[in-house]
Amino acid sequence: MKDKLITLEEIKEAYKKLKTHVYNDSFNLRLRTKLADFEYDKDIELLFEGLLYDINNDNIDKYLSKISTYILPKKVPSKKLGNTNIVRNDVCGFFDDIDLTEEDYNFYIDAPIEIYLIDVLWMMKEGFLLIDSQIKNDCYGNSLVFETNGDSYGIKHGHYLFERYFDKYQKWRDNGIKIAREQTQHKNDVLLVCLDIQRFYPTSLIDFSKIQETLQSRNSDLFLTGILERIYVSYQNVLDEVNRRKSKFPQLPIGLLSAGIIANWYLSDFDKEIKERFNPIYYGRYVDDIFMVLGNVKPNKNEDWFDEKFLYEEGSPLIPEKVIDNNNEENKRYKLRSHSNLYINSQKLKLFYFAPNHSLAILDNFQKRLDENSSAFWFLPEDDANETLNSIGFDIIYDDTINKFREISGIKNSKYGVSVFLTKQIKKEIICRDNANTSLKEDLFKYFTGNRLIDMYSLWEKVFTYFVVTNDTDAIRKFENSICKQIDLIKIKDCNTNTQLIRNSLQKHCTYCKNMAMALNYDMIDDIELMDLPCKLRSTYLIRQHYTPFPVIIYTDSKINNIISSDIYNELLTSDNINLTIIQVAPYINPRKIHAHEICLINLFNYIKNFSDTHSSFDSGKLIDELITYDLCSDINLSQCKGVKLENNDKQEVDIPKTTCKSDEFGNAKQQIKVALSNIKISNNDLISAIKGAPILNSAKRERHFHLINLSTEEKVDCLLLPEVSLPKELLVTYAEHSRRKQQLIIAGIEHIVSYNKCFNFSVVFLPYIHKGNKEVFILPRLKNHYSPDETREILKYRKQVPTLSPSIYHLINWQGVQFTVFNCYELADVLHRSLFKSKIDIMFAIEYNKDTCYYSNIVEATCRDLHCYFIQANTSDYGDSRLSMPKRSVEMTPVKIKGGDNDTIITFTVDIKSLRDFQRQSTLFQNKEDFKNTPPGFDHDFVSQRDSR
């Protein structure tokens, strides 16, 4: 027996990377389903040990024999109705058949999970060495995540194999545009060149002897490379049998992750030739798409100018050829000199010339469109009467001006637009279902019809999901039947075998799509025999977790059929059958990182369910320890210590724990913070309903909060402040995700939460930070110390109880160097409690639902000067007095103050932390009263420096 070449830990690492990739992939549902079946209810360690033995003993024939293939459409070609000048909206359903040629579909590898694991192991152990510095610089697609620390070179340990697709694609495109702009600003001519290799994967020829040669030159083992070659050859034999031909070399298998790495290496010599011949100021390749920028190049009027200048000389990397197409017309294509099997269609060669003294309108409008598309994912979905499926789902093609109807020459489908639109509708319906869009169902069936239904097969899952979310079983059946009917119309020219194969493949894909949707709500499954696959997908954590209102619930033992119900929060807090303990899942089983805010919320709900007046404090110190265990923070990020503990005249204890929150690479403290002060109206009816234990979350309230979040994103604020009892508990995850992604501090009051007859009023602070390159947010809730008399009467009126804290608790928080505390409305009336923060804070935030603005205005002004800090408070807009106040003379004290209005909005301002601290560091005698009021007697100047936590 050979020495052990692969270890069990390496197989676990490979499985973790494979599962994470599959989880984040929105396309390959067949592999996702295979993975769920492979793992579900199995002793997975035993499976790994079996694979370990087979690999190390070169016993993989049993896996190779199970390799097969399936076919999915690449595109559905549009048909024309002869020589007609009629523009029709029913062309997609006008023809009886859907005819496909070789250009219109792709073969995909279908193999046992063990094959995919060997594939990833090869990348981890040997394949990564194919990627040199040139490939790293030139290639933006399939970019491996390399270890950046220390002297080791290899793929980084953790969940991810590749860098995020969206980020790399954006860089590939934006870097070229940026350089082109810079050249025009320097008065240089610029030529943008876009190339696309025709059918790259299917026409590639991979010679593994050259791969071995490259790896040997870099001191790599070749054991796994030999196994990988057998996988590629076995798959090629399957393709050759299907297509009745014999290949000398295997092609790149679509569906194997290693193909992306080998593809980048395979074309690296072509990259080098192109750069040497064209000398571009920017060159980038995304798989088979090439984008380069040439400087100081000015085309002439000759149609063949580009070929004459760059391609007719000896040694050109592209060789022009004349070809006759299917319509017996002569066309041009370009053969790659380094790979004579690869071609670039002349129609895919695009040149864009920009003279520095002329308009850059094309570049500007293209960039604007890109920005609009990318920003679609920055904002939460708001209702827009003008945004319908019909307006989003089509792009109108004009011959001339858009103002004349006769200039319309046609329409084309917008797959991207429909995808974004459906995602928005799904999210809105999950959060609130008070008025499902009945017209959308009709529009969906009108849109997904005819050959367009097949062309949009990648969106089937989203349509099924929408119908599951809206509990529409009839629509699910109807949509499935429509798909089946259209699949039966597909024909592949001159190949009955492939016709049957693509039909079977699409039928399976339809089943996978439906089951992915059903896994979100078992109540939609009316046949127990159909529970198998949805149950496997959910149990292995491979569902679309981002759709669920409380994603971490699937990591508990809770048995909840419908995990996309917005009512899930009420169940969490009132049901004894729901266990809110996170199951310890092996890292290689969990396809995603559980975030800090999810653990925080689990702890909050457990605190509420298990609340005891005799032992009532929320143990955030224990929570921080738990986060450290999950590697979601370190003592660099979050720390807690007892700040103050004293007794007032009534012998009541007051406890002030201090929480420090900052990012790993925290530099200087924030000198200023930009604050968004909300101006929203809190409905008294909503308040009373929440106290009764029947909170209202309708579309209007959802829209209000989405709008506020989007405004804060648009304004790029550091902090968002909302009033008391303004935040529905159902939106806690939404706000936490926003705070995490945008690294935005959020302070708000949660609507009253009733659990076991106790009525809780919480303030909550979302504290974002970065840990090991990952964005996280720590949620710090605090139960109100002093319920107001009016509030207490309402609670007792409806036979609920007021929970009491002993001792009273306030938080002293240092976030990124800014030190503050939060008071919840009636707490401000306690002068002793306010005084505890003298010298200790830069800002006092106050959240209120308060009619008595005159009284509280006096408190604000007194507190602002007595504590010598900024005072920022948010109240419901109908009572007003939301404001920023500063310890300055009266005419300058309150530069921001808002009240009233019908629309919900925010007002932003910048709070200068540095200037206040610089002033407070000075001895009172030397302070300039033009800047701020003098610090009050007893102010501890030494405390100022302690606020800057570094």
Located regions from the model:
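C-terminal polymerase-core module
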Residues: V297-K446
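Conserved polymerase palm-domain catalytic core
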Residues: I177-V287, F291-W305, Y343, L351, ...
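C-terminal beta-strand edge segments of enzyme domains
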Residues: F550-T660, A862-T863, N875-R950
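Active-site-proximal beta-strand elements of phosphoester/diester hydrolases
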Residues: Q672-A694, P781-L783, V818-E827, F845-E848
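Conserved two-metal-ion catalytic palm core of "right-hand" nucleic acid polymerases
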Residues: M1-F223, F448-G450, K491-N498
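CN hydrolase (nitrilase-like) catalytic-core segments centered on the catalytic cysteine
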Residues: L537, Y541-T556, L721, S726-H752, ...
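Active-site catalytic loop in hydrolytic enzyme cores
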Residues: T629, C633, N637-N668, K758-S839, ...
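N-terminal, active-site-proximal structural segment of metallo-dependent hydrolase catalytic domains
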Residues: S26-I44, F618, D625, L632-C719, ...
